[in-house]
Amino acid sequence: MRHLLSTRDLSRDEAVRILDVAEDMADVGTREIKKTPALRGRTVVNLFFEDSTRTRISFEAAAKRLSADVINFSAKGSSVSKGESLKDTAQTLQAMGADGVVVRHPSSGAPHTLAGSGWIDAGIVNAGDGTHEHPTQALLDAFTIRRRLHGSAARGKGLDGTRVVIVGDVLHSRVARSNAWLLTTLGAEVTLVAPPTLVPVGVGSWPVTVRYDLDAALRDGAPDAVMMLRIQAERMRAAFFPNPREYARIWGLDDARLALLGPDTIVMHPGPMNRGLEISAAAADSERSTVREQVANGVSVRMAVLYLLLSGDGKADR
């Protein structure tokens, strides 16, 4: 694997391999010393042109647990804020000897541009580009679902027949896009539920079912997992729904809807959460919730991605 730019690029075998290596990395996390020398001598640069806390910290923790050297680059206060181009930044990192670059950028397609430009000879990981994709978030979501379904017998398995309902601001969600492609590649059945104003143009070409009635989707679909998406108000330049209270009433996972879910249905959220809007406090804190698991699993999955990207070997050094 040379780059990770989109879940759409992954075959089923490649996706399962990443999840299986992530299981090895999760084992590393249970040790007294949570480190492996797998990427000793390698340099990973976290190149973030957008604000981020959990994703950047997760990638930093992942690289350090693999014994890589980590450089954190923020656009604020850097030469980028003075007008430096992506090309010049990439060539600077090339001169510094970066082996892997984790990129978050407000423009959709920026990681693809970097990977195909020839400006830098490094493995590129897309950590979120505009409203396009967020591949490692989808991988950690799939990892979380697979672990909940199969436990210790998860290795080598996909998500065949698993029913996943993704609810909320699909229009602005790179998480929804990446999950739509990855989960279906792994064999899951994916249903998107959103207000009509928050469904993107072209969704008919996605391998999903689209519905607008959350109660009907939960009742008829008997989902194994319900994933609530954050309302991304910072990306909205118009009114996409009447008001927050109305949104929560029609499309939020409240206590009443939580009580109607099947006994083994899990509740997911990529974070950060707007409690009381897309998800109630009771749902977020319930035993069904995988929110904290997703954060922990994110480190293991990102370790797997960096390992496969920079070592070229599918077997983790135990």
From Swiss-Prot:
Against Pfam families, the record matches this protein to:
OTCace, OTCace_N
Task: Give the EC number(s) listed in the UniProt record.
Answer: 2.1.3.2
List the pathway annotation: Pyrimidine metabolism; UMP biosynthesis via de novo pathway; (S)-dihydroorotate from bicarbonate: step 2/3
Q: Which family does it belong to?
A: Belongs to the aspartate/ornithine carbamoyltransferase superfamily. ATCase family.
Physiological role = Catalyzes the condensation of carbamoyl phosphate and aspartate to form carbamoyl aspartate and inorganic phosphate, the committed step in the de novo pyrimidine nucleotide biosynthesis pathway.
For this UniProt record, give its keywords in alphabetical order, as a comma-separated list: Pyrimidine biosynthesis, Transferase
Protein name in the entry: Aspartate carbamoyltransferase catalytic subunit
Give the catalysed reaction(s), semicolon-separated.
carbamoyl phosphate + L-aspartate = N-carbamoyl-L-aspartate + phosphate + H(+)
- Any one Gene Ontology BP term: 'de novo' UMP biosynthetic process
Question: Assembly and partners?
Answer: Heterododecamer (2C3:3R2) of six catalytic PyrB chains organized as two trimers (C3), and six regulatory PyrI chains organized as three dimers (R2).
State the InterPro entries in the record.
Asp/Orn_carbamoyltranf_P-bd, Asp/Orn_carbamoylTrfase, Asp/Orn_carbamoylTrfase_sf, Asp_carbamoyltransf, Asp_carbamoyltransf_Asp/Orn-bd
Where, by residue number, does L-aspartate bind? 82, 174, 230
Record: residues binding carbamoyl phosphate? 54-55, 104, 134, 137, 271-272
* One Gene Ontology cellular component: cytosol
SUPFAM superfamilies from the entry? Aspartate/ornithine carbamoyltransferase
